[in-house]
Amino acid sequence: MTKKIFITRPLPKEVLSAAGLLGEVTVRENTSAMNESEMIDSLVNYDVVLPTLGDIYSEKIFASCNKINARLLANFGVGFNHIDVKVANEHGVKVSNTPGAVTDATADIAMALMLMCCRRTSEGERIVRANKWEAVSYTHLTLPTRRFGG
């Protein structure tokens, strides 16, 4: 029997292709968080659901289902605090996530923010756009001259 897979947001084509190898895929085109009715429907009518951060699978959602057919909430993201894992497990639904999926991106953003603070790039960009740039350097600090966290 073919698994019915519900993906709650449009995801990269690589994800959709991989999911398509595992079963019949339905993709919800709306990019906003699902409402309660949609979440209940997903648990009742699909075997696997790929929710994202805004889809709050609470105890109330599980309790509102007549019969839960879903066996897996495969969360597309690292955090899963929007899913009541204990209640999901009590209903025979396993919960997974993608640990490490955003580690590189998080490090990139941290570096960008540190550089922006040291080099004052946001401030400098506003000054340039306002045609108020003067010969005074806004970029004299560097990361090697700074100490972070103590």
In which residue ranges do the predicted regions lie?
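An N-terminal-biased, well-structured beta-alpha scaffold segment characteristic
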Residues: 1-96
